């Protein structure tokens, strides 16, 4: 089975690693995002997918423009059955969707048609969902609008954050990708159109999303903490200073006070009263300082927080 793979982040690399290690698949080429300069220093950052491709000596393409004539010619010279896409990061043009001998297959981390778009994992955590999943779909020109091949579901637990949920969804995708590709290759599966009337969408996460307002409900804030754990993180503004939050949890103590204010501060944490419930911050970071515990903050910055 000949495959052209497209992906960029670490979980995509795990899927590629699995396909590469399986003798049933012949990876004819890999498309990934161009290398990027590191913000600090002179190092160049290459994607996980790029590193794995080099490990297996796969032909790697890192186009800045998917419609570049030279790139198109390179792909047209490759014969492949499936284009497998896992979080590549760019819209796939129509010509590439029609390039595989069979179909283009996308691995999407939601139960489509829910959460079409760039941040389905974060969206499910932000909304406090109890269920997520992996949708294998035939790619189309529309945003995650293609026909559904198969859906596999996964329970979301309270300890899930963006990183751990993505890991579990990636494992679920790897567990089932053989079955999906085998059925498609043998033409033994019926694809189903999505119900567009039930579609919901999620946008790209922004750096500004990280700033939390403690006037919100406590469970909403906790869901943001889970969703933004990898990036952009969570922070709050106190006395015009942006303070990063590294660890927080719900307080089960019944504390009174005005929403958005610190109602208790000791070595166990900084307690913020919210619209409903109380949040305890146990690890934080002030600008240009190292990460510290609430006990250290109590000893060094007590006057700042009270």
What label would you give each PLM region?
Residues 2-4, 28-30, 59-78, 83, ...:
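Internal alpha/beta domain cores that form substrate/cofactor-binding pockets in large enzymes
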Residues 7, 30, 53, 83, ...:
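A residue-level signal for conserved active-site and pocket-lining positions in enzyme catalytic cores
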Residues 13, 43-46, 68-72, 118:
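Structural motif corresponding to alpha-helix initiation and N-cap regions
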Residues 34-54:
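N-terminal beta-loop-helix "entrance" segment that forms/cooperates
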Residues 82-201, 208:
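Donor/substrate-binding cores of folate-linked one-carbon enzymes
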Residues 203-216:
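Acyl-group handling in specialized metabolite and lipid biosynthesis
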Residues 214-306:
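An anion-binding loop in the catalytic cleft
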């Amino acid at each position: 089975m000949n495959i052209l793979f497209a992906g960029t982040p670490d979980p995509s690399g795990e899927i590629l690693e699995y396909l590469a290690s399986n003798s049933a698949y012949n990876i004819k080429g890999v498309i990934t995002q161009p290398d990027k300069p590191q913000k600090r220093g002179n190092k160049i950052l290459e994607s996980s997918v790029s590193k794995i491709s080099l490990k297996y000596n796969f032909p790697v393409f890192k186009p800045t423009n998917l419609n570049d004539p030279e790139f198109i010619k390179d792909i047209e010279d490759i014969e492949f059955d499936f284009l497998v896409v896992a979080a590549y990061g760019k819209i796939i043009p129509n010509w590439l969707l029609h390039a595989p001998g069979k179909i283009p297959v996308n691995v999407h981390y939601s139960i489509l048609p829910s959460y079409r778009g760039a941040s389905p994992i974060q969206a499910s955590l932000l909304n406090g969902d109890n269920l997520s999943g992996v949708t294998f779909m035939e790619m189309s020109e529309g945003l995650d609008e293609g026909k559904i091949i198969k859906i596999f579901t996964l329970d979301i637990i309270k300890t899930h954050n963006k990183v751990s949920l993505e890991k579990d969804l990636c494992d679920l995708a790897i567990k089932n990708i053989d079955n999906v590709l085998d059925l498609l290759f043998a033409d033994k599966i019926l694809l189903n159109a999505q119900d567009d009337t039930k579609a919901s969408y999620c946008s790209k996460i922004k750096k500004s999303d990280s700033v939390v307002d403690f006037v919100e409900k406590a469970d909403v804030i906790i869901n943001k903490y889970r969703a933004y754990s990898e990036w952009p993180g969570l922070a709050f503004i106190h006395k015009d200073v942006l303070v990063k939050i590294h660890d927080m949890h719900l307080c089960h103590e019944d504390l009174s006070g005005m929403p958005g204010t610190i109602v208790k501060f000791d070595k166990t944490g900084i307690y913020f009263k919210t619209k409903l419930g109380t949040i305890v911050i146990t690890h934080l970071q002030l600008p240009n300082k190292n990460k510290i515990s609430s006990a250290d903050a109590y000893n060094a910055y007590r006057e700042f927080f009270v």
